[in-house]
């Protein structure tokens, strides 16, 4: 298979949109919210194996060099860092401080000005899902550097794999570095999937039964060895991501899920504060909370599109 031309890479912002990518992103962000609500099911090992790898894989699908490192940093600053810093300052710094001083509400992660730099340490902060935007920025810059100097696809993949193992598993680094680089290999797989047009070329009827069977079977094994466990988890995640993408390719579009997938960054940056608000309202049923959150975005997304486009990567 020959690699696709750079101009054929899908976009998350404009006219070259591929509908089932929005569907996949919608499934992904809804799984994230489901997880943060603390909902537990017998399928948790499978869902947990797919949730974050899928998000990073999709990010790799959309990777572009933009003609140089400065252009890449400028683009990713607009799409990742500006939303990160805006919502970090408002929901992880100002909100906890004001809630503490005005309402007497305390946050487990703190409520003073030390929250300004909490994301650079090992500590948690109130709107913890924001780490993903910061982490994606690091992964994009790191991947640009690697693919700029490593021309072999195999060596590039091995480099991402080794960096992911060392930085993400063997070391414990602050500023969400370990957390982000633990998924670096899936970023590479997403990039390669678009480079060689893998998802488009695969036939759903032929490949889906195989990937689904592999996904289910991989979840039955629980090795105790660290190396075998890493291989098993990687195989489980890759099979799960492929299965979900092929399902989305077959379905193409589900109105609500595809809609929130297109604006998934808005759900990412706001769902944790909304969950805390529901906690204050003492809604004890996570399924009810999930439905309330899902319904609220029918109003939140249009509001943010109109009044907050620059801080939600819409401009």
Indicate where each model-derived feature is located.
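Alpha-helical transmembrane segments and their immediate juxtamembrane cytosolic regions
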Residues: 1-315
């Amino acid at each position: 298979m020959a690699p696709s031309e750079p101009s054929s890479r899908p976009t998350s912002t404009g006219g070259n949109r591929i509908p089932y990518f929005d569907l996949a992103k919608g499934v992904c962000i809804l799984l994230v919210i489901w997880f943060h609500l603390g909902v537990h099911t017998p399928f948790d090992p499978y869902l947990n194996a797919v949730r974050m790898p899928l998000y990073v894989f999709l990010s790799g699908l959309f990777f572009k060099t933009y003609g140089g490192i400065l252009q890449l940093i400028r683009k990713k600053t607009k799409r990742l860092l500006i939303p990160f810093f805006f919502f970090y300052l408002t929901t992880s710094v100002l909100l906890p401080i004001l809630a503490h001083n005005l309402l007497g509400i305390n946050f487990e992660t703190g409520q003073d000005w030390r929250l300004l730099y909490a994301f650079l340490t090992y500590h948690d902060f109130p709107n913890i899902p924001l780490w993903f935007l910061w982490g994606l920025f690091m992964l994009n810059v790191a991947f640009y550097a690697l693919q700029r100097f490593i021309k072999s696809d195999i060596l590039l993949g091995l480099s991402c794999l080794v960096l992911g193992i060392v930085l993400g598993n063997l070391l414990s680094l602050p500023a969400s570095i370990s957390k982000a680089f633990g998924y670096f290999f899936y970023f590479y797989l997403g990039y390669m999937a678009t480079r060689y047009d893998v998802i488009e070329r695969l036939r759903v009827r032929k490949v889906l039964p195989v990937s689904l069977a592999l996904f289910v079977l991989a979840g039955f094994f629980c090795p105790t060895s660290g190396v075998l466990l890493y291989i098993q988890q990687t195989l489980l995640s890759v099979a799960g991501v492929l299965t979900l993408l092929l399902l989305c390719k077959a379905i193409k579009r589900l109105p609500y899920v595809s809609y929130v997938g297109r604006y998934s960054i808005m759900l990412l940056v706001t769902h944790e504060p909304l969950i805390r608000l529901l906690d204050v309202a003492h809604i004890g049923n996570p399924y009810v909370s999930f439905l309330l959150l899902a319904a609220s975005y029918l109003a939140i997304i249009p509001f943010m599109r109109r009044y907050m486009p620059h801080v939600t990567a819409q401009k």
